[in-house]
């Protein structure tokens, strides 16, 4: 009898299972890294808005605006007012929120900036004053 060369069915199944497991692990890690990157983008945007409000807007107005848009925050890139999905702060479904309080007309005394994160609890920055 001649011995046939090739792989047995069991060897093929084991190889397929190992490759499938490696693929699943790769996809899970990729998704975790992507979510972490988006969370970092959200934190960066909230910090940029926060420092713009504290260092530029507050000294100029003597308070904080009742609503946020690119007109009030001229010292920063207006794209930072949009979350990673492209939804602007204040719009329905945005990951970012601006909640002013103690308002007198268009000027407010306090605010809370908030970003909903995928991998952590919400990221918040509150007014200094």
Task: Annotate each predicted stretch with a short phrase.
Residues 22, 26-36, 51-55, 69:
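N-terminal "domain-start" segment
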Residues 34-62:
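Membrane-proximal N-terminal amphipathic helix
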Residues 103-129:
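Short, surface-exposed interaction loops/tails
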Residues 53-85, 129:
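Short, glycine/small-hydrophobic-rich surface segments
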Residues 4, 41, 105-108:
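A generic fold-level signal
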Residues 90-105:
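Short, surface-exposed beta-strand/loop micro-motifs that present aromatic residues
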Residues 65, 99, 114:
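Residue-level detector of conserved, well-ordered beta-strand and adjacent loop positions
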Residues 2-30:
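N-terminal single-pass transmembrane signal-anchor helix
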